[in-house]
C-alpha cells in the first residue's frame, strides 16, 4: 500500500473540478466553489462517513467488485484518515466541497488508484443520506440518555416532596392545593412523551438508503442487506428515488426536538417565576445562576431564561427544514445541502438544554413553608367546600353559588375560608357544620381527598412515582 503526505498546496484548475472534470471546459469559479462547499459544517459526519465507506467496501468485496486486498487497503486507509482527523492533523479543503470528497481524496493520496474504486456503485446522494441517518441515530441515543437522567432527577425530587403542599394554578391564579411532587410528576409526563417520540422517530431514521446511488439504483450486484447489517440498520429503503431525497426523518426529529424545547421552556418559565422575590417557592443553587454588573443583590436564573430563549431557535430550525423541502421535485437537489445546519443546531441546542436541566433539577430546593403559605391564600379550598355541600345533598351549581358568596365575604374581610368563623359560614348554608374545617378547609384534607390514579394525594403521587420507575425501565429496555 502506498502512502503520501497530505499536501497543503492550493488545487489546480483540474483538481478543482476533479469530481466531474470530464464534462466541463473550465474550472469552477473560486467564489462558486466556496459558496457551494459544505465541508465547513458537514465534516462533523466524518465518523459516519468513514463507517459507511468501510461497510460499502466490505460489501463490494463480498460481491466481487473489489478484491480482498483492495478492501483491506481501503479499510486500512480509512482507519488511518480517521486517526488523522481525531488528532487534528487532517486538512479540510473547501475546493473538495464536502466531507465525502475530502476523505475520498485523502484516501487516494494514501493508497493510490484503489482509493478511486471506493465510490463504485455509490453516489454522494445516497452516501450523505446514509451519513445523516447514522449521525442522527447516534445523537438520538445520546439525547435519550440525557432525558433519562433528567427524568430520574424529577422522580427523585418528587419522592422527597410528596407531602409538600403548594398552590396549583389556572390562568396563573390560585386554583386548588396540589403537592409539589404532583407538579414535578406533570413535568415528568411531558418528558416521557418526548422519549416515546424520539424512540418512534429513531425507527424511521434507522432505514438505510445506501445502494440507491444517485436516484435509480446501481447496475452492480450489491448486497444492501449485508451493508445494512454491518451498519446496524434495521432495514433498507424500498424506493431509490425517495431514499435519496427523503428528509422526513430530520423534520420529524426537529419536531420532536421542538416539543422537548417547548416543555423545557414551560418548565423554565415556572422556575423563573418561582425563584422571584414575589414567589420564593424554589431556590436554584448559585452555580446555575449569574449576577449583575451593576446591581449587587441580583441572582439571576440565567439557565432557565436562556433555555426559554433557545426554544425559539429550535422552532425556527423546524420551519427551516419544512420550508427547505416543500418545493423540491424528486429526486435529490442541491437545496438539501441546507438541511444540515438546522438539524445540527436543533441537536446541539436540545442536548445542551437537557444537560443543563438534568444537572439542575436534582439540586432545586423548595421553600416548603412559603409554598404552604401561598396555598393558604387565594381561597384554594373553595372547590372542596362546594364538594362538601354537594355530599350533603346540595346541587353542585347551588353549592357553587353559596361558596362564591362565602369567598366574597372572605375577600371583604381579608380572610381565607378557613379563617372565617362557623357562624359566618352558616349564614350562607345551615348545612355547614363544625366538621367543615377538618373535612374541607384544610390543605391536607384537600389534597388527601383526591385519592385516585392521576390525583394529587401523597398516596397517589407515591404510587405514580413507583409506576414511573417501571415505565422507564420498559421504555429504555
From Swiss-Prot:
Molecular function terms, GO-annotated: argininosuccinate lyase activity
Task: Give EC number(s), comma-separated.
Answer: 4.3.2.1
Is Amino-acid biosynthesis given among the entry's keywords? Answer: yes
Which residues belong to the signal peptide in this entry? none
One GO cellular component term noted in the UniProt record for this chain: cytosol
- GO BP terms in the entry: arginine biosynthetic process via ornithine; L-arginine biosynthetic process
- Enzyme class of the recorded protein, top EC level: lyase
Pathway as given in its UniProt record: Amino-acid biosynthesis; L-arginine biosynthesis; L-arginine from L-ornithine and carbamoyl phosphate: step 3/3
Q: List every stretch annotated Disordered.
A: 1-21
- Report keywords, A-Z: Amino-acid biosynthesis, Arginine biosynthesis, Cytoplasm, Lyase
- Quote the catalytic activity from the record: 2-(N(omega)-L-arginino)succinate = fumarate + L-arginine
Here the segments flagged for biased composition (Polar residues) are 1-18
Q: Where in or outside the cell is it found? A: Cytoplasm
| InterPro entries reported in the protein's UniProt record | Arg_succ_lyase_C, Argininosuccinate_lyase, Fumarase/histidase_N, Fumarate_lyase_CS, Fumarate_lyase_fam, Fumarate_lyase_N, L-Aspartase-like
Q: Does the keyword Lyase apply?
A: yes
According to its UniProt record, which protein family does this protein belong to?
Belongs to the lyase 1 family. Argininosuccinate lyase subfamily.
Q: What is this protein called?
A: Argininosuccinate lyase
Q: Which organism is it from?
A: Acinetobacter baylyi (strain ATCC 33305 / BD413 / ADP1)
